[in-house]
């Protein structure tokens, strides 16, 4: 007989948003994680953000060089400062790691592998680095990771540069690394579409995490 727990681990809810501001989504992630219990179905949120710099818990103000007209938001994820903006694939991973039988390091490795495999599908040879989380093409960073684990559940996630204005990265030391060069899929695949990359990554993730079914829902949790 199938139990509630086994049903939850087999199903993933996916929510897709348009271009949205950062703080309402961040607060919704916090609320979802605080309220979830052992029977809460895992979720993945796919979206783009209006321009914003986010400063992680380990963030040092000296890495924010000249933000100009782009707001800087102090947040509760790991890592240093990064930039989010239109044309970047944001993925928020709201997962019960205990149910998935994963530790934080396992999750990071899985995310990096799904990104490398997604990029390979576009003919881009990418790799992870042991000394600096994220995914790189040569010495240029194409995807960033920043997670928080609370009561065995993850939130925040990853940012993959697809087709965006990279100039704002020059206003910071990305992820705390002075002079770190950023790149994006468009530099290798000029006609790339954000939606196709989102679908390609999602397929890799569903397979890697072992979900058996995907349910698409609209709006933030509680808005249905």
Curated annotation (Swiss-Prot):
Q: Which reaction is this enzyme known to catalyze? A: octanoyl-[ACP] + L-lysyl-[protein] = N(6)-octanoyl-L-lysyl-[protein] + holo-[ACP] + H(+)
The residues responsible for catalysis, as annotated, are 175
Entry's localization field: Cytoplasm
This protein's major location comes to: cytoplasm
GO BP of this protein: protein modification process
Q: What is its EC number?
A: 2.3.1.181
Q: Recorded GO terms, molecular function?
A: lipoyl(octanoyl) transferase activity
Name the enzyme's class. transferase
> Looking at the keywords, is Acyltransferase present?
yes
What pathway or pathways are given for this protein in its record?
Answer: Protein modification; protein lipoylation via endogenous pathway; protein N(6)-(lipoyl)lysine from octanoyl-[acyl-carrier-protein]: step 1/2
Q: Cite the binding residues for substrate.
A: 77-84, 144-146, 157-159
All copies of the BPL/LPL catalytic domain together span 38-213
- Site annotation (Lowers pKa of active site Cys) points to 141
- A Pfam family cross-referenced in the UniProt record is LplA-B_cat
Q: Does the keyword Translocase apply?
A: no
Functional summary from the UniProt entry = Catalyzes the transfer of endogenously produced octanoic acid from octanoyl-acyl-carrier-protein onto the lipoyl domains of lipoate-dependent enzymes. Lipoyl-ACP can also act as a substrate although octanoyl-ACP is likely to be the physiological substrate.
The record's NCBIfam families line, in alphabetical order, gives: lipB, PRK14342.1
Question: What else is on record for this protein?
Answer: In the reaction, the free carboxyl group of octanoic acid is attached via an amide linkage to the epsilon-amino group of a specific lysine residue of lipoyl domains of lipoate-dependent enzymes.
Name of the molecule in the record: Octanoyltransferase
Please tell me the species this chain comes from: Hahella chejuensis (strain KCTC 2396)
State which gene encodes it.
lipB
């Amino acid at each position: 007989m199938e139990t509630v727990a086994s049903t939850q681990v087999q199903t993933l809810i996916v929510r897709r948003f348009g271009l949205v501001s950062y703080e309402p989504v961040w607060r919704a992630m916090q609320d979802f994680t605080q309220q979830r219990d052992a029977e809460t179905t895992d979720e993945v949120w796919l979206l783009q953000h209006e321009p914003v710099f986010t400063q992680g818990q380990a963030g040092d103000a000296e890495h924010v060089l000249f933000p100009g007209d782009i707001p800087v938001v102090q947040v509760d994820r790991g890592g240093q400062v990064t930039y989010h903006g239109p044309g970047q694939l944001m993925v928020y991973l709201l997962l019960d790691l205990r149910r998935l039988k994963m530790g934080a390091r396992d999750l990071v490795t899985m995310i990096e592998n799904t990104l490398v495999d997604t990029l390979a599908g576009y003919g881009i040879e990418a790799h992870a680095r042991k000394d600096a989380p994220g995914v790189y093409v040569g010495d240029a960073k194409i995807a960033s990771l920043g997670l928080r684990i609370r009561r065995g559940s993850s939130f925040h996630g990853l940012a993959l540069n697809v087709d965006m204005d990279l100039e704002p990265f020059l206003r910071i030391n990305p992820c705390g690394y002075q002079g770190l060069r950023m790149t994006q899929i468009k530099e290798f695949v000029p006609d790339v579409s954000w939606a196709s990359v989102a679908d390609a990554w999602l397929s890799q993730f569903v397979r890697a995490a072992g979900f058996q079914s995907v349910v698409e829902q609209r709006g933030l949790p509680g808005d249905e």
